Amino acid sequence: MQTLPTPTTSSNTANQATFDTTIKRRKTRPVKVGNVTIGGGYPVVVQSMINEDTLDIDGSVAAIRRLHEIGCEIVRVTVPSIAHAVALAEIKQKLIKTYQDVPIVADVHHNGMKIALEVAKHIEKVRINPGLYVFEKPNTNRTEYTQAEFEEIGEKIRETLAPLVITLRDQGKAMRIGVNHGSLAERMLFTYGDTPEGMVESALEFIRICESLDFRNIVISMKASRVPVMVAAYRLMAKRMDDLGMDYPLHLGVTEAGDGEYGRIKSTAGIATLLADGIGDTIRVSLTEAPEKEIPVCYSILQALGLRKTMVEYVACPSCGRTLFNLEEVLHKVRESTKHLTGLDIAVMGCIVNGPGEMADADYGYVGKTPGYISLYRGREEIKKVPEDKGVEELINLIKADGRWVDP
C-alpha cells in the first residue's frame, strides 16, 4: 500500500542557519493506475517491462509476477496486434487468479487505435507513442510541410485518438503519452527539427486533444537515448506545462541505455539529474539485461536522493593508509548481516579521522580507533570498545539491545 511521504528537514544549532536538504518535487496531479498512484505527492513509482511474447500467456504471467515480487509496482507489456490484446486479457485474469492483481500498462505503437481500444477493456493504462500512433510513411521527396498539411494530419490524429480517450475517460483508466526522440513524426521533424522542442510539441498536441475531451488521467514521458537530449526535453516539458497551467506527472527514463555498469551510470545520470530538480513521478531504468535487474537500480537511485528508503543506508569511507582493519571485508560482513534491517543507517569507518564526524547522522557506527579494537557507536555516542574479531557480532548485539533487530 502506498503512503504519502513524510517531509524531513535537517537542522543545525540555534545560532546557525537552518537548511532544508529535501528535494522539492514539482506539484503534479495524482493519476491512478489500478491500486498505484503516480504523482500527487505520492512516492516515485518504480516500473519495468517484461520481454516475453505476450502470446505466451504462462510465460508473461510468470514474468510479471517475478517483477512485482521484487518491487516493480507497474508492469508494461507490449501489444503489437489484436491477438496480443486478447492474450493480455487472459494474462490479467490469470494473474488475479493465481497471484494477485498487478497494474499493467499496454504498450501500443504503429496505427494502434483498434489495438488500444481492445486492450483498454482489460488493463489499467495504455501507452501510446505520438510519433507512431497515426503513422505517416516518410516522403523522401518532401522539402516542407505547409500549415494546411500540418493541420490536416492533426485532424486525422484527433479523429483516431478521440475514441481511445473517451474509452479511457469513461472507464477511469490512464494513458501515457510516451514521446521518443528517435520516432518523432515527420511533420514534427520538418517543423521543429530533431530537437527537444519537437518532442514537447508532439506531447502537447496529444495533451490538448485529451483535454478537449475532458480527459486528464495522463502521464507524460520524453525519452531519448542521449542523456543531454533527455534531460533538456523533460526540463522543457516541465516548464511548458507550468507556463500553460498543466500539472501532469512525468515518467522518467533513458531509452536504450545498454547494459552493465555503463548502462546503469547512463540511466542514473539522466534520471537522478531530473529527480534532483524535483522533476519526475515514476521511473524506469531500461537495461539490455533481464528486467529483474532494473528494479534494484531504480530503488538505489531513489534511496540515494532521499526520495524513498527501502534498504539499509551504509556509510563507509574509501579506505586509506590510516585504516586500522580490512574495510572492504568488514563492510561486506556488516552488509550481509544487516541488509534486511530496512530503515537503518549504519556507518563503517576505518579510522578516527573519518569516524564520528562523517557518520554523525548514522544510527550505528563501527569505527577503527585502536589497532586490534573496534569502537561501536549509537549515533554520536561511543558505546563500547570490542576486539576486532568480535566487532560485527557486537554490532548486532547492540542493535538487538535497542530493540531494532528483526530476524532475516
UniProtKB/Swiss-Prot annotation:
EC number: 1.17.7.1
Catalytic activity reported: (2E)-4-hydroxy-3-methylbut-2-enyl diphosphate + 2 oxidized [2Fe-2S]-[ferredoxin] + H2O = 2-C-methyl-D-erythritol 2,4-cyclic diphosphate + 2 reduced [2Fe-2S]-[ferredoxin] + H(+)
InterPro entries: Dihydropteroate_synth-like_sf, IspG_bac, IspG_bac-typ, NO2/SO3_Rdtase_4Fe4S_sf
Signal peptide extent: none
UniProt entry keywords in alphabetical sequence: 4Fe-4S, Iron, Iron-sulfur, Isoprene biosynthesis, Metal-binding, Oxidoreductase
Record-linked Pfam families: GcpE
Family assignment from sequence similarity: Belongs to the IspG family.
Protein name: 4-hydroxy-3-methylbut-2-en-1-yl diphosphate synthase (ferredoxin)
Species this chain originates from: Nostoc sp. (strain PCC 7120 / SAG 25.82 / UTEX 2576)
Lineage per the UniProt record: Bacteria, Bacillati, Cyanobacteriota, Cyanophyceae, Nostocales
